[in-house]
């Protein structure tokens, strides 16, 4: 009885001591952690709120240079024409003429293409383009009287509305000038002699061939899609060496034998 009683007491002691050991918390160094104070949570909350306040206070200062930079970038932005196309405008009227812009402000057409007929068409806005002579460095313009001329500065008179016709030709009408009563647009046109016509003329209509221009732009050379493969040439095997045979001395041909004919009679 005494042994069994002692065994039961020992087991009960082990069972009671196990929960007490589990409640102890150990730090990474193996030492028991100090008890947590309820006031520490409030202290940590105070520190976090102070940190958030300092960061929020410093954020407007950091953001202000960025806002100033964006404003300076917006103010320094300059408009630049886009969609540049370099080529010539061919009018199908008469024998056919290329639109030319002269340095002195004259505008007409020439049957043969020249440096004066090299034009640069660039987009200003949706459907609105400008036309500049590459050689003369002047812009095609239409005055309030409908006369075509070249302008050194790009103004509203230099803006034209580009439209694509069903016959693959284009028409160019002034973006600001038109007939006030009827609202008819004024078009860029050439007559049969290659001279510029007034846009306000009642005969200048989008259906007439004098207003039809075919853009002839220089297409960029497309890269070749094919490629060549160089195969190393196979060297022919050397011919087998043949021993040189000594040439036999030439034999002299024997002298011809002469036969005498003998005639026997009777």
From Swiss-Prot:
Secretion signal, residue range per the UniProt entry: 1-17
CDD domains on file: beta-trefoil_FGF5
Glycosylation: residue positions: 108
GO cellular component assignments: cytoplasm; extracellular space
Family: Belongs to the heparin-binding growth factors family.
Gene (UniProt): Fgf5
Domain of life: Eukaryota
Regions annotated as coiled coil: none
Species per Swiss-Prot/TrEMBL record: Rattus norvegicus (Rat)
Main location: secreted
Keywords: Glycoprotein, Growth factor, Mitogen, Secreted, Signal
Gene3D superfamilies membership: 2.80.10.50
Low complexity bias: start-end ranges: 38-72, 244-256
Subunit comment: Interacts with FGFR1 and FGFR2. Affinity between fibroblast growth factors (FGFs) and their receptors is increased by heparan sulfate glycosaminoglycans that function as coreceptors.
Protein name, entry field: Fibroblast growth factor 5
Swiss-Prot/TrEMBL GO biological process terms: fibroblast growth factor receptor signaling pathway; glial cell differentiation; neurogenesis; positive regulation of cell division; positive regulation of cell population proliferation; positive regulation of MAPK cascade; regulation of cell migration; signal transduction involved in regulation of gene expression
Subcellular location: Secreted
GO molecular function, one term: growth factor activity
């Amino acid at each position: 009885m005494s042994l069994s009683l002692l065994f039961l007491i020992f087991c009960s002691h082990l069972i009671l001591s196990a929960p007490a050991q589990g409640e102890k918390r150990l730090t990474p160094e193996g030492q028991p952690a100090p008890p947590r104070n309820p006031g520490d949570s409030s202290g940590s909350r105070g520190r976090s709120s102070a940190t958030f306040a300092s960061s929020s206070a410093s954020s407007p200062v950091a953001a202000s240079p960025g806002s100033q930079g964006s404003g300076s970038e917006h103010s320094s932005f300059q408009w630049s024409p886009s969609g540049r196309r370099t080529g010539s405008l061919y009018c199908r009227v008469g024998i056919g003429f290329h639109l030319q812009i002269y340095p002195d402000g004259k505008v007409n057409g020439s049957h043969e293409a020249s440096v004066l007929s090299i034009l640069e068409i660039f987009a200003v806005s949706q459907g609105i383009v400008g036309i500049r002579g590459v050689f003369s460095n002047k812009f095609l313009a239409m005055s309030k009287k409908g006369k075509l001329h070249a302008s050194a500065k790009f103004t509203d008179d230099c803006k034209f509305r580009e439209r694509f016709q069903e016959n693959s030709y284009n028409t160019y009408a002034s973006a600001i000038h038109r007939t006030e009563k009827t609202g008819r647009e004024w078009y860029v046109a050439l007559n049969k002699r290659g001279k510029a016509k007034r846009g306000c003329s009642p005969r200048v209509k989008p259906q007439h061939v004098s207003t039809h221009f075919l853009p002839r732009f220089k297409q960029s050379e497309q890269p070749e899609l094919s490629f060549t493969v160089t195969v190393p040439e196979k060297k022919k095997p050397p011919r087998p060496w043949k021993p040189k045979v000594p040439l036999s001395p030439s034999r002299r041909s024997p002298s011809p034998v002469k036969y005498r004919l003998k005639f026997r009679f009777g």
